Amino acid sequence: LAERHERPLAGVFTRWYAALRIATTGPEEAAEAAYRDAAVRLEGCGMPGLEHGLPPLALLSLRVLHRRPARTGEDADWGPYEPWARPLVLLAEGRRTAAAAALRDVPEPPRDLLSEALWCLTAPAAIAVGDRETMERAQAELSPAAAELSAGSGLLTVGPVSRHLDDLAAALHIPSSPKTS
């Protein structure tokens, strides 16, 4: 359909959405393969905001979704998402002090379709280094989206926002919010 109507980007977005669906319902390995396949379609698509940064961000989100550390030793092009990825990568490298310093420099995420995902990446880093102020900010920013899947972008997810809120509540020693459906 995309080819027939000369809309090549439709195929890019449907491939990314398919990878997202696998990430939410399938095994981690299948989701990683789907994201890597979708990333190939970004090359030269004319959308630098997606081409630079999105592929490694999707893989990092998948690892956080499965409660696994960031990959290290890779020369990832984090693009505009580098500030949110850096603390998790440093933690995976065993560099807790550097991760805490990087976390202090993390800006507020842009108020866009990836805002919740970026907060869901910030939250476990804040928990890991015991940064209460950042945990409280993440909790306040994520609370309105408690019943949602993080990142309504159709491209990636870090899982249910409620799970991240539960983790934050446990770390902050406050009661979890009641589940909404």
Feature roles, as predicted:
Residues L1-S181:
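Helix-coil-helix junctions within alpha-helical repeat/solenoid scaffolds
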